[in-house]
Regions:
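Surface-exposed, low-hydrophobicity interaction/linker segments
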Residues: 34-36
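A short, hydrophobic beta-strand-centered structural micro-motif
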Residues: 38-49
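Charged, amphipathic alpha-helical segments and their flanking helix caps
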Residues: 1-31, 48-153
């Protein structure tokens, strides 16, 4: 067993959350940036929610994360977003048997209170893989709370 650094732990938590969203939606979920797809989601753990040294349960970090969903069709975007909203609680913590807790260092993965209603879909431009011209598509952002612990593996 080797010590897991803070950055390694954060990366593992981000990957576990993205894979969890993929299992729920069955759709492509990328980490940090859109690779040039008009139908996908991008998950990114952003910043400490309550300060630089914020803690939860004494040794875990509470982060605000975001999920950007991209679709060429606005109705398909709304369906994808509603599926995710229905799958995640807003205020409930992960229970002891949660698959994320068993396979990673994530203690809590839930919708942030600010995501009670779906934000308005907006248009954005994407340069699809293999093309040079921009394509307009719809996007919406959902916020998540992620509480994870930097720990030994």
């Amino acid at each position: 067993m080797k010590p897991c650094t803070y950055i390694e732990s954060l990366s593992k938590a981000e990957t576990a959350c993205a894979e969890h969203i993929h299992r729920i939606t069955g759709e492509s979920v990328h980490i940090a940036e859109n690779p040039g797809l008009t139908d996908c989601a991008v998950f990114d753990i952003g910043y400490l929610q309550t300060g630089e040294h914020a803690t939860f349960k004494a040794s875990a970090y509470h982060f605000r994360a975001k999920l950007d969903i991209y679709r060429r069709n606005r109705q398909n975007l709304q369906v994808a977003a509603m599926r995710i909203l229905e799958s995640f609680p807003i205020n409930a913590d992960c229970n002891e048997a949660d698959v994320l807790r068993e396979s990673s260092n994530v203690h809590v993965f839930r919708l942030a209170p600010q995501t009670q209603g779906l934000s308005e879909a907006t248009t954005t431009s994407i340069v699809p893989i293999g093309r040079t011209d921009q394509v307009k598509c719809w996007t919406v952002t959902l916020l998540f709370d992620v509480v994870f612990q930097a720990r030994f593996e």
